[in-house]
Amino acid sequence: MPLKLSLKPGEKFVLNGAVVQNGDRRGVLVLQNKASVLREKDIMQPDQVTTPARHIYFPVMMMYLDEVGAEKFYEEFATRLNEFMGVVRNPVVLQDCIAISKHVMAREYYKALMLSRKLIEYEDERLGHVSSGVSAGGDAG
């Protein structure tokens, strides 16, 4: 099933590891086969990895962007997820953590990544006074 991306003028995204930028007009891109695509708003930079949930999101993002080298990010992901689950008591969030782990084990990195956003949202609700990295809505800052 094709993936249709509607792009804003100047919008950047990563396509199979390459940074691509749309021109000065709105555009539509249709991908006919499987590819790793991540919009600029969903990309977290290393200096934005400042909270426990973001320490989960980042290695999942790297596994998604570099499926061939995913194993080098797995240990960091597993360690950080285990730490997070050790302190969280919310059963819904714990179920999300389990689902993220299952998606990663199945190499369904995009699903794991999008579910990891829920952890950031949960964390942002608890630490609302802290503003750093990719927000649950995808806006940096």
From Swiss-Prot:
Query: Please, which domain of life does this record's source organism belong to?
Result: Bacteria
**Any GO MF annotation of the entry:** mRNA 5'-UTR binding
Note whether Repressor occurs among the keywords: yes
Keywords carried by this UniProt record? Bacterial flagellum biogenesis, Repressor, RNA-binding
UniProt GO BP = bacterial-type flagellum organization; mRNA catabolic process; negative regulation of bacterial-type flagellum assembly
- Give the family this protein belongs to, as stated in its UniProt record: Belongs to the FlbT family.
| HAMAP family on file | FlbT
Q: What does this protein do?
A: Has a post-transcriptional repressor function in flagellum biogenesis. Associates with the 5'-UTR of fljK mRNA and promotes its degradation.
Name of the protein in question? Probable flagellum biosynthesis repressor protein FlbT
